[in-house]
């Protein structure tokens, strides 16, 4: 059975200490989080993140990291970082934003699987577009974790 999901997938919050943030959000909002995960970026660097088990939309905590992409660095400050959507055509969306989007996870033939718009592209907020298949797999993983 294929998982169902909504295009509005999650809200990303940038944090200094992901373990402490998961504990704080858990105690304050009554949320439970999946274990912290790491993911490779197109630069070869990694990022650390975790999703709430309640959703969609989910709350994603992302630990600050000074990567060469400059998306999650300490200069961004803690707080609301991005909103994320499932996208059936990430390469097309990337092209539509032109120089206002950065690929963070690549796919076959260099085609983008995950992109972030730059803050100036949409009134100071970043928008993350994730390949729909990735969102469906994540949704299924989180749904299974709550069983």
Model-derived regions: residue spans:
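N-terminal beta-strand motif that seeds the catalytic metal site of vicinal oxygen chelate
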Residues: 1-22, 78-85, 141-147
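Vicinal oxygen chelate
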Residues: 1-2, 16-23, 27, 50-51, 53-57, 75-147
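N-terminal strand-loop-strand beta-hairpin
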Residues: 30-54
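A short, acidic/glycine-rich surface segment
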Residues: 36-38, 67-71
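Amphipathic N-proximal alpha-helical interface segments
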Residues: 56-68, 129-134
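A short, polar/proline- and glycine-enriched secondary-structure boundary/capping micro-motif
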Residues: 70-75, 137-141
């Amino acid at each position: 059975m294929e998982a169902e999901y909504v295009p509005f997938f999650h809200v990303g919050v940038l944090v200094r200490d992901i373990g402490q943030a998961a504990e704080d959000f858990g105690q304050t909002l009554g949320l439970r989080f999946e274990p912290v995960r790491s993911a490779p970026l197109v630069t070869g660097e990694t990022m650390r993140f975790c999703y709430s088990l309640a959703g969609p939309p989910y709350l994603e905590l992302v630990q600050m990291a000074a990567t060469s992409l400059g998306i999650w660095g300490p200069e961004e400050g803690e707080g609301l970082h991005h909103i994320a959507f499932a996208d059936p055509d990430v390469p097309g969306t990337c092209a539509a934003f032109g120089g206002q989007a950065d690929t963070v996870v690549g796919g076959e033939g260099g085609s983008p699987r995950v992109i972030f718009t730059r803050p100036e592209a949409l009134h100071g907020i970043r928008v993350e577009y994730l390949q729909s298949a990735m969102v469906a797999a994540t949704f299924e993983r989180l749904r299974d974790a709550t069983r």
